[in-house]
Amino acid sequence: SKFVPIAAGGGGIPVVIKDNNLQGVAGVIDKDFSAAKLAEDIQADELVILTTVDNAYVNYNQPDQAPIGKVKVDQLKKYLEAGQFAAGSMKPKIEAVINFVEKTGNTAIITSLRNASKLDDGVGTIVYN
């Protein structure tokens, strides 16, 4: 198979041993950033982040909403700086793919789970250098 699923972050409770007991500690791991870091560390050819929408969008949920298709990382950074992406939603995904593309020079894709089988067809938001 040419696809290797990568999953990281979320779902665990971080603990430390204190006085011979396990004690929960605050620790939040962003799934998008950890997936991008893992993809970078294993030298993945491509990072794919699956979400509930087919693309990232400019002017999301506005009358002039428009999907972002193939986009250079520099343009995506401009959209990010303009506040186009919601914190805690699309923003961390955008930041993660920007970091991955800038550090590796490889491509990243944000799309929906239903599009996962169509990646070779150019679906989703495709971020490149």
Predicted segments with their positions:
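C-terminal catalytic "cap/lid" subdomain
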Residues: 1-129
